[in-house]
Amino acid sequence: MGDEGLRALPSVDRLLNEAATPALVAAYGRPATLGALRESLEWARARIRAGGAAPDAAALVARASQSLEERLASTLHSVINATGVIIHTNLGRAPLSQAARAAVEDVARGYSTLEYDLDAGQRGQRSLHAEQLLCQLTGAEAALAVNNNAGAMLLALTGMAQGRGAVISRGQLVEIGGGFRVPDVMAQSGARLVEVGTTNRTHVRDYETALADGADIALILRAHHSNFRIVGFTTEPSLAELVVLGTRHGLPVVDDLGSGALLDTAQFGLMHEPTVRESLAAGAALVCFSGDKLLGGPQAGIIVGRAAVVEPLK
């Protein structure tokens, strides 16, 4: 009975000539349709060997159609965020506002001035659109947007400290979501990691010692603690103190703000987060932060700061 059922199965060519198959080829392409039909035949053979009945050609094509539909269906679905985490990076990060969605739809439905200067009648700069707004929002001289904040830090370290030292407190060598670790990003950039202080206590004098050793140091890096806090017997220099130290040694300070608040979050009853303007006002030469968390935009890493520092990164 098993062998008879196997012999009764239609060939792939016959399945291709079934009435419903041309629509599958038109929708999914011939290679994908062929693959799905062959998978249907494999399923049928296994079913027959297990004692089941042999399906007819129409049933095999219907199974292939269902397989193609499921395989190519979107895996993104709307969900309700009941986690208690307001901005959940695994659930799409910050939802886009209605105004932002409308602006995207308005531009994305056709051609745009993404990289064209209408007044000059020639190619323009695609980064200019975001840069102008970011400079207005933060007070920075120049700005640049990349894929994510890890990418922003990687670009900054590569452009400013490749082959040279970058000084950072041991308490800031954190790992953020997605497995991004500050030491790994620094290693990939080609910068040499110079750790100072301890996990819970780092002083200005620790930075001073590292800078006085005669090592080739390019910058001082301050990294956001991400989503954890060390409490108790702790201390670390303020950004202003690091800027004073950097100025004395002729070194820029790069401040990785993580989520990157543009507004004072305390006014909404939340813990105060350092704002981008505060970092720049304190004297940071360059500030990196995310565009898809507190800023409320799509996934992005944003770099703002002095023009002399940002421009070479472009």
PLM region descriptions:
Residues 13-17, 35, 42, 62, ...:
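Solvent-exposed alpha-helical segments within well-ordered globular domains of core cellular machineries
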Residues 42-45, 85, 264, 294:
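Glycine-rich phosphate/diphosphate-binding loops and the adjacent beta-loop-alpha structural elements
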Residues 1-69:
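Long amphipathic alpha-helical segments
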Residues 121-314:
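Conserved PLP-enzyme active-site core in the AAT-like
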Residues 9-10, 80-84, 295-298:
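Short Gly/Ser/Thr- and Asp/Glu-enriched loop/turn motifs at secondary-structure junctions
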Residues 50, 54, 86, 90-94, ...:
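Short gly/ser-rich anion-binding loops that grip negatively charged ligand groups
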Residues 37-38, 42-43, 82-83, 93-119:
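Glycine-rich phosphate-binding segment of PLP-dependent enzymes
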Residues 51-96, 102-103:
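Long amphipathic N-terminal alpha/beta scaffold segment
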